[in-house]
């Protein structure tokens, strides 16, 4: 572990210890709390700059849209990727962009926090129960109704998927609203959604067609990841060989490259690269299945509504696994490569 990573780990532990009780003084909501309140202005707080974490917020935004169709939603995010992700969400009114490096942008960082205090909201939702800054910002914001994000015991008893990072905020919101006498909501949870336009889908198809130069459906792989989530070249070489043996006659097999322009299969497959998140999504949306280790691009594929196979070297697929549209998470310390191939076959049936 690098010194920087060690410092960040210690910082998170200290901040979590300091802020874990923030919001504990708020009592359970009751129907009295919503008297004379019409929920029109909502603030969702998710101060994380990573692509995957921002994409994992899209189901919560959809849930708020569906529950309060006429509301305006402000987002408190970190970095600039949220602007691309929520570009086609008409309900988004404003995105507060917290700088990724606060100590290099102290004034902007402070102004973002101060701006939260200046505006009144009807409802504030902390999108990450483990975010210290999220809890502090939720506490700081002006609103009669606040969801801090703690997973209540009754949710844990009722839902076996409550651990998932994009699902529990929705379960929390539904529980909170039921306490306010809103109708009980047991509808299917929203999936990650980039809301690609027809033009973006058409452009993605054109790029894919130019790469493949045939009409066969496409399997796309992404071989990069961070730390111990990243599989070795030997692992990917073996897996790529199995993909070719089982699918090459009927499917194109291509690789999406990361910004580092590296390939764990040594560029043996036709490949493409893009810096544009929405263009990447448009290309992926035209493929039959997307295969990747646990990373932000895996969530991007899921948000493009493409069946996504997430390869997990850690046992945390219940928290981060792709879901919906036939997607699944495979724990590769339990599943063999051949079992992974069979799972892909089942998706493509």
Where are these regions (language model features)?
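Donor-binding and catalytic core of enzymes assembling or modifying cell-surface/extracellular glycoconjugates
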Residues: 231-317
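Conserved nucleotide-sugar phosphate-binding/catalytic loop shared by glycosyltransferases and other
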Residues: 75-106, 330
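Active-site donor-nucleotide binding/catalytic segment of nucleotide-sugar enzymes
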Residues: 41, 45-47, 191, 195-262, ...
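Short internal beta-strands
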Residues: 73-79, 253-257
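Short amphipathic alpha-helix
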Residues: 54-64, 81, 239
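Positively charged, low-complexity intrinsically disordered leader regions
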Residues: 1-39
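Nucleotide-sugar donor-binding patch of glycosyltransferase catalytic domains
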Residues: 2-4, 148-149, 271, 299-349
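Conserved nucleotide-diphosphate donor binding/catalytic pocket of glycan-assembly enzymes
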Residues: 2-7, 96-193, 215-222, 315-318
């Amino acid at each position: 572990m690098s010194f920087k990573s060690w410092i960040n780990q210690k910082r998170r532990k200290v901040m979590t210890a300091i802020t874990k009780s923030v919001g504990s003084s708020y009592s359970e909501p009751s129907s009295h709390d919503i008297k004379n309140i019409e929920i029109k202005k909502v603030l969702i707080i998710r101060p994380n700059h990573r692509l995957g974490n921002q994409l994992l917020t899209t189901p919560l935004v959809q849930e708020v849209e569906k529950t309060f169709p006429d509301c305006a939603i402000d987002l408190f995010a970190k970095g600039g990727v949220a602007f691309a992700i929520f570009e086609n969400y008409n309900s988004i009114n404003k995105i507060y962009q917290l700088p990724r490096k606060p100590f290099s942008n102290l004034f902007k960082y402070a102004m973002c926090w101060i701006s939260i205090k200046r505006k009144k909201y009807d409802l504030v939702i902390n999108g990450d129960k483990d975010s210290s800054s999220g809890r502090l910002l939720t506490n700081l914001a002006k609103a009669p109704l606040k969801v801090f994000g703690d997973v209540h015991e009754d949710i844990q008893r009722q839902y076996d998927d409550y651990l998932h990072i994009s699902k529990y905020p929705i379960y929390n919101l539904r529980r909170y609203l039921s306490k306010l006498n809103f109708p009980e909501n047991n509808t299917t949870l929203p999936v990650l959604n980039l809301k690609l336009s027809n033009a973006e889908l058409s452009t993605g198809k054109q790029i894919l067609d130019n790469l493949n130069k045939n009409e066969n459906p496409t399997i796309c792989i992404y071989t990069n990841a961070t730390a111990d989530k990243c599989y070795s070249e030997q692992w990917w070489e073996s897996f790529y060989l199995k993909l070719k043996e089982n699918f090459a006659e009927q499917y194109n097999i291509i690789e999406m490259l990361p910004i580092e322009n590296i390939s764990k299969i040594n560029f043996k497959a036709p490949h493409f690269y893009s810096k544009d998140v929405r263009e990447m999504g448009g290309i992926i949306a035209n493929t039959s299945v997307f295969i990747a280790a646990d990373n932000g691009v895996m969530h991007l594929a899921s948000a493009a509504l493409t069946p996504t196979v997430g390869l997990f070297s850690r046992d945390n697929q219940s928290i981060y696994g792709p879901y919906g549209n036939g997607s699944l998470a495979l724990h590769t310390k339990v599943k063999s490569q051949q079992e992974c191939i069979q799972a892909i076959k089942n998706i493509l049936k």
